[in-house]
Amino acid sequence: MKKLKLYKFILAPVVLLSLQACFVAKDYEQPDVVKEEHYRTDTFPKDSLNMANVSWREIFTDPLLTGYIEEGLENNIDIRIAVQQVIAAEAYLKQGKLGYFPTLNTNAQITHQELSANSQFGSLFSSIDQYELSGSLSWEADIWGKIRSTKRAFQARYLQSKAAHQAVKTRLIADIASTYYQLLALDEQIRITEQTIENRRTSLETTSALKEAGNVTEVGVKQTEAQLYTAMAILVDLKKQERLLENFFAILLGEAPMQIERTDLAEQEITTQLHIGVPVQLLRNRPDVIAAEYNFVNAFELTNVARSEFYPSLTLTAAGGFQSLDIKELLDPNSLFATLVGGLAQPVFNGRRIRTAYEVSLAEQEQARLNFRQSILTASREVSDALYSYEAATEKIDIKQKEFDAYDTATEYSEELLNNGFANYLEVLTARENALNSRLDLINAHYNQLEAMVNLYQALGGGWQ
């Protein structure tokens, strides 16, 4: 009879292990959300090369800018928050890896019981002291793949946090570069405006002299004076933008607001050849797209976990240790005890908790799939936008340069004609105003080209290493 019981206990775990092959958990397959869509450009080559594989140090070569990027990657608050999210996800991953192992608990216990005189043993003992030193071991068979899916969900969550960390790095590099270039553009606009103010002060003196000579009226003097004040107001706005941008730039570096040292806009050159790669590379290079897919994997595996709750769970529990009424005999061989239990639990009625959890997991899985698809569409749009913006900015620089040259020449001619009495002052004022606006627009065009290059770098996945 004892042998029969022993065979039953040996057979139980063998059956449990053999049933583990009967998984109901589905294996993840990448959804059909990515198609070989084409970028809307004929200018850049679509081949295996991709500037996302190029380190940011090869794209942003300004020595001060590279130093700021390195400082930002080290100190930026968003980066440090992302690192902590990775650490938290890694802790869950370690937990998931141990899901197949049994749980072990130890227990040391002293029990004192006062007995009623009318109880079963009250006439023999007034009180009982019991001492126990024991341990218990519990193991659940992963028949339906719940533990495996939980482990994979934790793994996907960890990889998602890593990709999200990389996405924060790419965005930070782009933000630092873009803000730096914007500061350079403001420096140039401030320089031009200050130069314009000095020229208009000189023009005001000349106009006043012409009025004394009877060549212009008081109206001409006041219009020149008004143009001077217009330029001074523009300078105030530009310096305000400069201060606000410097404060924002300092925050990107993880620093308090401060003055930012920088070079000149004229020194900035685009030395890296722009390769956009092929559309499918977005899956490998865009960290936000990678994070979106891992989020979908996480939701998929959690749906497997929710589905497994419909099926019975098989557990094997063993307990043993020492138990005695006398502490002196606690470690005596006669105090040994042991228990081995195999259990099968099938959910029957639980207030629809399991079905609700499963339906919610299906809805969250579909949300994650749609977010993954949306991230692909957004990435394609951002690449197309950045490509066209770069092409347009490059073309506009040439046009704006010609426009400024024409206005500058017109200003020079009109002032000469005015001094010789062959032009009215309205022509001079118009030419000067157009020349200033055109020159400021030309600076913006140079900045827009650099900004488009930064956006293209980020849209393609950005070499954040």
PLM feature spans:
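Regulatory alphaC helix of protein kinase catalytic domains
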Residues: T43-E71
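Bacterial Sec-dependent N-terminal signal peptides
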Residues: M1-V34
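Sec/SRP-type N-terminal targeting helices
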Residues: R80-I81, K97-L98, A141-K169, V219, ...
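Short segments within alpha-helical structural elements
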Residues: R201, T230-M258, A306, K402-L460
